[in-house]
Amino acid sequence: MVAKDYPFYLTVKRANCSLELPPASGPAKDAEEPSNKRVKPLSRVTSLANLIPPVKATPLKRFSQTLQRSISFRSESRPDILAPRPWSRNAAPSSTKRRDSKLWSETFDVCVNQMLTSKEIKRQEAIFELSQGEEDLIEDLKLAKKAYHDPMLKLSIMTEQELNQIFGTLDSLIPLHEELLSQLRDVRKPDGSTEHVGPILVGWLPCLSSYDSYCSNQVAAKALLDHKKQDHRVQDFLQRCLESPFSRKLDLWNFLDIPRSRLVKYPLLLREILRHTPNDNPDQQHLEEAINIIQGIVAEINTKTGESECRYYKERLLYLEEGQKDSLIDSSRVLCCHGELKNNRGVKLHVFLFQEVLVITRAVTHNEQLCYQLYRQPIPVKDLLLEDLQDGEVRLGGSLRGAFSNNERIKNFFRVSFKNGSQSQTHSLQANDTFNKQQWLNCIRQAKETVLCAAGQAGVLDSEGSFLNPTTGSRELQGETKLEQMDQSDSESDCSMDTSEVSLDCERMEQTDSSCGNSRHGESNV
């Protein structure tokens, strides 16, 4: 799972901490204060200051989006007030220090007289990007341990067991990438060029299989970290880190997600090197082999991570009664998507789409853990009817919020319904935006088509491009593309779980469920 330095206070020049004032007349000695004069550390962080050794702060290279979940986090930047912050970085004068560069041609002062073709320069740039990315990754992984793990352990902010759960096998990943970086540097010529990288990659990439345990642990790690943030000591520590320069305005989870982001980027990096490698270069065959290796590893880890995520959420489902348990849930190995939606009363629901069953729940706190209490019966995907509702077609009701919203067009709703004999359900669900709604529609359609195909009831597309269910004769739009894993559905859509509201309504929901007979057919109003 990318992702996305040390002291909590820095020594600074007096000039950086005060407003510019006209020079006062006085002895020259007063005007020329030593440039290394230090200011007193902030009192609120004195307990943390000596725990973290200073390191060089370098910008994190931004990674492209990946095909698995990539949880994005936004941090609000505070405006500077009058004087610049004590830790504000001043641009170094070009005459004394060269600006750090991420480009091979700038780093090694490539001269046009070296007779390199444009394609070869691009190849060297791609190889250097691979090497530089390893260096950045190693630095950030070490930072995560020294700036977060070790201080929290020493200050007893978290227990060792909790930190082991959150950080997983992160320590074991550092030597792997140090080995690759060392090999890449060894084959680099004095002029900065690299002739062959294929054999190195073919020999090194198989060790990335060890990412299996780290990535599979991320769902549980993220959940525990979010839970621990309710502890004011943890929240205070993480907030101070976020406001410190070493963090680059990234929170702890951004750093913990960097290994996964790096893993899924390797195929792109290797393809870029291959694209600029001449056909007669011996490296081409090795690069093609390396791409096949990393694609297989990523696919395998992706599968195992998905299974781990599915198990995690199945273990946190709470059933109000035995009749809600469904063998389709127990047999599911893949969680197609999940996230927060609202019903037509504005009540927050957390919906899970497993391989063959849709489960609508309410988030509750149980034994100090976030769990998901089933609301109504699970809906088999094969019997599920999906309807895309036009904006304004659904009216909010049953609350003050709904009373004042009647004049507005209610947007981003879709409806799922189910009828099997005397059992029936209808739920109008609202996504937070159009994109999120379309993701849900695509994912449900894809899951339904997969189930029907597996049952030998493959639907057909009519002339209008709709999916025709041969069993019911109902017509649905065909999903355009297979949905990416929606592990970021809550974070990217800025939806947070309102556990306080859920806890208050828990008893009311139980009474509602007990009073609802199986033959009752109506909207999912809580």
Curated annotation (Swiss-Prot):
Residues 291-449 form the PH domain. Widely expressed. Highest levels are found in adult brain and skeletal muscle. Lower levels are found in heart and kidney. The keyword Glycoprotein does not apply. Its main location: cytoplasm. The keyword Cytoplasm applies. Residues 122-304 form the DH domain. GO terms for cellular component: cytosol. Keywords: Cytoplasm, Guanine-nucleotide releasing factor, Phosphoprotein. InterPro entries: DBL_dom_sf, DH_dom, Endocytic_GEF_Adapter, GDS_CDC24_CS, PH-like_dom_sf, PH_domain, PH_RhoGEF3_XPLN, SOS1_NGEF_PH. Interacts with RHOA and RHOB. This is Rho guanine nucleotide exchange factor 3. It comes from Homo sapiens. The gene is ARHGEF3.
